[in-house]
Amino acid sequence: MTTNYIFVTGGVVSSLGKGIAAASLAAILEARGLNVTIMKLDPYINVDPGTMSPTQHGEVFVTEDGAETDLDLGHYERFIRTKMTRRNNFTTGRIYSEVLRKERRGDYLGATIQVIPHITNAIKERIIEGGEGHDVVLVEIGGTVGDIESLPFLEAIRQMAVDVGREHTLYMHLTLVPYLAAAGEVKTKPTQHSVKELLSIGIQPDVLICRSDRAVPANERAKIALFCNVPEKAVISLKDVDSIYKIPGLLKSQGLDDYICKRFSLTCPEANLAEWEQVLYEESNPGGEVTIGMIGKYVELPDAYKSVIEALKHGGLKNRLTVNIKLIDSQDVETRGEEMLKELDAILIPGGFGYRGVEGKVLAARYAREHNIPYLGICLGMQVALMEFARNVAGMENANSTEFVPDCKYPVVALITEWRDEDGNVEIRTEESDLGGTMRVGGQQCHLTEGSLVRQMYGEPTIVERHRHRYEVNNMLLKQIEAAGLRVAGRSADNKLVEIIELPDHPWFVACQFHPEFTSTPRDGHPLFAGFVKAAGDYQKRQVK
């Protein structure tokens, strides 16, 4: 099998949506029967995003095999069926770490280690390794052309055309085509200069994606084609849209997939986008709306909860409901109390780290429990629900987690010091372990309790969901909590770790230690989010009555 590579770069400004554009193109190519995957190359020095602030970098997306990756990989999995792995994302930091490790071992036999060829070779090796077994690999280069940090990656992808053949490489460049109200027209000069910058590196783009708040007129696209040495049919207008799931259709309508298939000499049927048309139909024809409050500590940057937000929308699609998400700072709940939680049809508490805002989350969990409001707790959201129940129902005064109060009397949540990974190897963690790369992370089996609400929603006895945490329910105190009315609805494969809890006497109160948002997609949804949004709609109807 010959693998073809599409390298996606961005120019003029950041945040043009390279990841969405790449994922949308991948969705069309997949719909043509091609085996497609997507990679993200990040130019920052961090080894991975695992220890980066969510308010700076957004969420950390966890893959099935336990890699902590860029949030763009979440977009990739929501658009295509291929599951991402640790091969699909790497950073400058990881590349340099590997090269330096080899140098220390003496692998380079005393050679002077340089960016070219050692760093660029390592990058190319990673790209080729990640693309094995696929017809087409889309490779998104993080950052903006012109950034110093991106230069080794750009040089590596320039060399790829030499290594694998120009006929198997395509360069797709996203640029901004701004509209100037004073002039009453779009301006192409920024795009021309961005392409000039790319040419100075040795890369001639084959496709230009022109991002604008409106459709770029044909005459302006012809002008861009002339000055940038790109065929007119390869200059694509990509305007702002109210739903990212419209983008595959927009790209297909301009023949981008046909152009690429011809460029790679690929013979494949026309793309069938019926599934995406169904998603858009469900999105544009809701039967009602619900308001769900998300109580978090990183709410100033919604991207910190990107997959949760998307999963809630997917749950809305499956119930033909528009989901209005109200982001609420958990510290505001601490200071202003229950007034922050009124007018909500459901409450969701997502994952997080650190004690700041935790008591606000505990208060929100109590409010949901006492007022029969649907509640979904994820990761830390399960732990605070357990703390709240232990304190106010099970009689464990000031019950807490050892993450926040190490010497508390009732440590209902405690550090996992030992477990087995997916290969059966024993993992050991202590308070002294590094923060990076030391969590229980990735896909883990969970056995669902017969007769539980979650068993009913999933429709099967065993599931696999993705984790990212260090702390777990303390089994030593579990019997007292269960005796007070809490039900364990799911356990780990070895039956030692509590994965899901429910309140049988509550209309819909579910909390899980894993992150179900990472496996939700617009086409398939997710059982927990579909059930949660349905419960929000049912609660709203009860309130009206």
From Swiss-Prot:
* Enzyme class label: ligase
**Gene3D superfamilies in the record:** 3.40.50.880, P-loop containing nucleotide triphosphate hydrolases (3.40.50.300)
Q: Where does ATP bind?
A: 15-20, 72, 239-241
An example of a Gene Ontology cellular component annotation for this protein is:
cytosol
Q: Where is the active site?
A: 379, 515, 517
Q: Where along the chain is Mg(2+) bound?
A: 72, 140
The EC designation for this entry is 6.3.4.2
Catalysed conversion reaction: UTP + L-glutamine + ATP + H2O = CTP + L-glutamate + ADP + phosphate + 2 H(+); L-glutamine + H2O = L-glutamate + NH4(+); UTP + NH4(+) + ATP = CTP + ADP + phosphate + 2 H(+)
Specify the domain of life of the species encoding this protein.
Answer: Bacteria
Q: How is its activity regulated?
A: Allosterically activated by GTP, when glutamine is the substrate; GTP has no effect on the reaction when ammonia is the substrate. The allosteric effector GTP functions by stabilizing the protein conformation that binds the tetrahedral intermediate(s) formed during glutamine hydrolysis. Inhibited by the product CTP, via allosteric rather than competitive inhibition.
Citing just one GO molecular function, the answer is:
CTP synthase activity
Secretion signal span: none
CDD domains per the UniProt record, alphabetical: CTPS_N, GATase1_CTP_Synthase
How does the annotation summarize its subunit structure?
Answer: Homotetramer.
Give the UniProt family note. Belongs to the CTP synthase family.
Q: What does the UniProt function comment say about this protein? A: Catalyzes the ATP-dependent amination of UTP to CTP with either L-glutamine or ammonia as the source of nitrogen. Regulates intracellular CTP levels through interactions with the four ribonucleotide triphosphates.
Protein name per its UniProtKB record? CTP synthase
Q: Which organism is it from?
A: Yersinia pestis
